[in-house]
From Swiss-Prot:
Keywords: Membrane, Photosynthesis, Repeat, Thylakoid, TPR repeat. Gene3D superfamilies: Tetratricopeptide repeat domain. The gene is ycf3. TPR repeats lie at residues 35-68, 72-105, 120-153. This is Photosystem I assembly protein Ycf3. HAMAP family: Ycf3.
Length: 173
């Protein structure tokens, strides 16, 4: 039974009903509609913390989805699950796949930077200054791209870039 048919949350159920109506009315093919149902069920499972079910639904959605922007969004959600589970390398690989599908996803770049920055802090705490600088430079690189895609949207990142001396003047408007 699809997750949407067993949702007890009134708001989620209302959203699902409205989304189903919109999908039925849109002039899209059956394959795209089915991909959306899997995506929506994956999102619902992810929001409930059922990551295994979410991943299953997202994988099914990816098998059907042909739109690069929608594929990128699905891959981003998969990467978020990997990141939440501490699977940083898989998360980075999946964020990159999401960006390959849709390069205009600043949140993928932001999250990749979080992983690099965390690795930099760990290396710094362990006294590996050169490694730390390398990780911080990688964080700065992807964060600079994120800020360029979403100016003013990541003030904390902009502040980090400035405070660490890794900012580029052309990033800020």
């Amino acid at each position: 039974m699809p997750r949407s048919n067993r949702n007890d949350n009134f708001i989620d159920k209302s959203f699902t009903v409205m989304a189903d109506l919109i999908v039925k009315l849109l002039p899209i093919n059956a394959r795209a509609k089915e991909a959306y149902v899997y995506y929506r069920d994956g999102l619902s499972a992810q929001n409930d913390g059922d990551y295994a079910e979410a991943l299953e639904n997202y994988e099914e959605s990816l098998k059907l989805e042909e739109n690069a922007i929608d594929r990128g969004e699905t891959l981003k959600n998969i990467a978020i699950i990997y990141m939440s589970n501490g699977e940083e390398e898989r998360a980075l690989e999946t964020y990159q796949k999401a960006l390959d599908e849709n390069p205009k996803q600043p949140s993928c770049l932001k999250n990749m930077g979080l992983i690099y920055e965390k690795r930099g802090r760990t290396a710094e705490e362990e006294g590996r200054r050169d490694d730390a600088d390398g990780w911080f430079d990688q964080a700065a690189n992807v964060w600079t791209q994120a800020v360029r895609l979403n100016p003013g949207g990541y003030l904390d990142i902009e502040n980090w870039l400035k405070s660490t001396g890794r900012s580029n003047v052309d990033v800020y408007f």
